[in-house]
Amino acid sequence: MLAEIAAQKEVYFVSGICEKDGKDFYNSSILVQPDGFIHTYRKTHLFNEEKKWFSPGNTGFEVFTISGKFGEAKIGMMICFDWIFPESARTLALKGAQIICHPSNLVLSYCQNAMFTRAVENRVFTITANRTGKEHNGGSELYFTGESVIVDPKGNYLARAGKDDECIIITEIDPVRANDKDVTPLNNIFHDRRPDMYMD
């Protein structure tokens, strides 16, 4: 269905899915193109009881180029709990991502604020689409924290939903802004890195 809508409207979609591959199940995210081609990312960092049901992702963090009337943009994907590992967003940024799409079922209350840091430390746009409401399973209950959020490369919140809002947020962004990695005239977040000092 998403592929049909993408073709009709000439748009791209990023969506979370449960993916079956042989006997393995993955918590995955797909980037659906208007031409029907689908890119897949499999969640690297499984959260809590996900480890009982899903296999750890094996795709790695890849960046995909999309194009249309807006020009071109480079998209990376990470899923939910991937956010807590700064290497996730940094890997995507180092590979050229301008926009990091982050479909989520967040239950921890502080991720949406942490996405400010992921955006600023990598000078990218981050788009977190989170679930709202409660889910009951047997005797347990999960509360999803909502507050879907879009942050720009300088840490400005371009949009933020409420905790219980089920909504569509439309925001215009210029992906080229994410190409500027200068913090000051003498500091560039990538050129100033010291990988030789980061080893275990």
Show which residues each predicted segment covers.
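Active-site donor-binding loop signature of nucleotide-sugar glycosyltransferases
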Residues: 43, 66, 153, 163, ...
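A conserved C-terminal secondary-structure "cap"
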Residues: 178-200
